[in-house]
Amino acid sequence: MKTLNKLMLSFLLTFAVLQAFSYDFQEGDLRYTIISANPPEVSVSGHANGTSAQGALSIPETVLHDGITYTVTEIGVRAFQYCQALTGDIVIPNSVRRIEQEAFEGCSGFTGTLTLSNQLTYIGESAFLGNNLYPMHLHGNLLLPESLDVIGSQAFLGCSGFTGLLVLPQCSYIGQEAFRSCSGFTGDIVIPTSITHLEDGIFAHCTGFDGTIVLHDNIENIGNGTFRYCSGLTGELVIPESITLIDVMAFYDCESLTGTLNIPSSVVEIGASAFAYCYGFTGELVIPESINEIPHGAFKECVGLTSVVIPNTVTKIGQLPPDCLNKEGAFEGCTGLTGTLQLPENLIRIGGMAFKDCTGLTGELVFPPSLQRIDAEAFKGCTGLTGDLVLPVSVSIIEPDAFRGCTGFSSLQIKNAVSDVNIMRKAFYGCTGMHDIEFTEKVSHIGSNAFAETGWEADQPDGILMLLDWCLGYKGNASNLALQLPETTRGIADCAFTGNTNIKSLSIPDDCPMTKISDSAFYGCNKLAGLLTIPNGIKTIGQSAFERCSKIKNLELAPSVETLDYFAFDYCTGLESITSWAETPPLVKYSFYDVNTDIPLKVPCGTMEAYQNNSQWSAFTNISEVPFKLTVSVDHPDHGTCSIVKHGDCDNPESIVQATPNNGHEFAFWAIDGDIVSYDQTYTFNLEHSTALKAHFDFESVGENDEYAFAVYPNPGKDVLNIRTGLKDAWVEVYDLNGRMIYRQEITENDTAINTTNWSEGTYVWKVFSGVSTGSTTLAETGKWIKE
């Protein structure tokens, strides 16, 4: 069937070619096809010598054949296509009513004028088309007869030699790009009243027009690029109220148009880059309420505009489509816009580069509560914006460079977000005036250099840069750095330590709430050496997280690790062993390129076969099983100690741990992830999974005379926060990391239980004050508590 279809297609193509060059008779140098016997009419099918024809072309009004006089009424399809040696003028006799498609395409030898029939009604597609290989050299004025009804697509494309378009008749149709690149035309463009749709690119690249555009009240649509690059057109652009669509690039680079741009309320859609680079428009631009989206590039570099009024009907400004090649912001580079920018109440999205380099905008930038995302470079370089930058709770994405170089902002607030917030690469880079930063615990990702070169960064002392429990990197140039992240670390920004050659060791606490080591976090830290332990709680090791850390010798992956993203440990050529405590082999995405696969890979009891059958882990040839990992810790080092008495193995899993309280304390319980598993001080159990046990201690009985006995437990916890103290006349306060007090209660008993069921996961700060009744309050104790 496929073969038959191919044969049929080949036959049809061959038939079409033969049909295009077939003829009925030849008289002189021309061939003719009879198109009517009564009255006798013929079409000129071509030259007797085909494309080798030379010299002047003479087309008669009539031709005598076999005693019959035929009227020549048509120039046929491709009749003289690519006859490059034909020279002189083209004179179409007045008998001709139609010039079919591609009739004179590529006839680059004609250097004279074009005279059209005064009875001509139809000019087909590409009839006089010229291109780079076969340019058209016709010159002089192009006089189109009043009889003309249809001008096909690309009919005169590239006829740059014409110097004037004398009459644009009352056609019913002018096709796409009909006069594109006719750069010699001068004067005005007057659209006939018979045209209701201006097709795409009709006058694109007609740079010679130096008059005005006259649009009548019957026009409904202005097509894609209709007047694109008509840079010489002048005067005020009057858009009639009949128009509903101004399509993509309709007036792109019409740089000499002047006056106020008035868009009527009839317009329901403005295409991307429709008025980009129209430098001459001035004054206030009012977007009609009929518009609900301002596309990307719509008014780029309309530098003469001084203000813009955007109605509340607009929900998106400048959203870039996926894989957009022509990336232009809606108001990018509109340097003439001044004063405060009033954004519409129902705005959902501010697109890429929407207000980039609008340096004249001043004052505070106030966002509507409906806003959900701010795309890349949306306000990049808006140096005149000042005050506090407060993002609404609905914002979930701040894309790369969104506020880069906005030097006037003094602070940033991202509070009480209703969903996870993604702050991407260099979002606030170079905001040198931004000294205070507050954001919600719902921040789920911080891209590389998101807060680099800000006032906040400049204010920080040398050391680890921590912003509300997010690690952004290291400030200073300490050598042989033993990098130890805080226990409260919730995340590491992308590329936080990329290329830091001073780090010699890395310690990430087991109890920190972080679940991912971000992309390229330690890329190229080629002094990082020895044992690298990925602690429990980490689920993902990001792309290139430790790529080219060539001096790491031993790698230990916690039981929680699920994914090693692309290139995570590529070129870690110094690795001598890997231990993975995960019972299910983590997903590996080509994460060990150029790592010696003969090194030992140690996996938990009973999992060797799973690793050997895994498509990525099976590359390692030396896989063996080891006992499950067992670790013990205490709730507070001042409360007591603990130890492993017996560590079970693959054959005998029985294990024993022991807790020893310090003076003034007593053992309470053993817990795993906050869940109590035993009240036995010496706890015996079977080690069947990698296990992290924590010993919890209480104070010995607290009496009324105990001036200062204190405990907060469990920590981390889930549904309850217990505070034990001997203080009287006291109260407790709990704050989130934005400094907002979320709980306050007077302490009346030795033990105070706070229900935390409805609290969000994260880190909280608790404070206990004494001296309530005296009015001389004192902070007695403070610390952090983690809700899991």
Name every feature range the model reports, one short phrase each.
Residues 47-49, 657-664, 724-726:
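Acidic, Ser/Thr
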Residues 682-691, 753-756:
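Solvent-exposed segments in extracellular or luminal domains encompassing
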Residues 77-78, 100-105, 124-129, 152-157, ...:
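Consensus positions within tandem repeat domains that build extended binding/scaffold surfaces
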Residues 37-39, 53-74, 84-98, 108-122, ...:
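Structural signature of tandem-repeat unit edges
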Residues 665, 705-713, 717-788:
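C-terminal outer-membrane/trafficking sorting elements
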Residues 653-681:
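Surface-exposed interfaces of beta-sheet-rich extracellular modules
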Residues 627-633, 696-713:
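Residue-level detector of functionally pivotal "anchor" positions at catalytic/ligand-binding pockets or at interdomain
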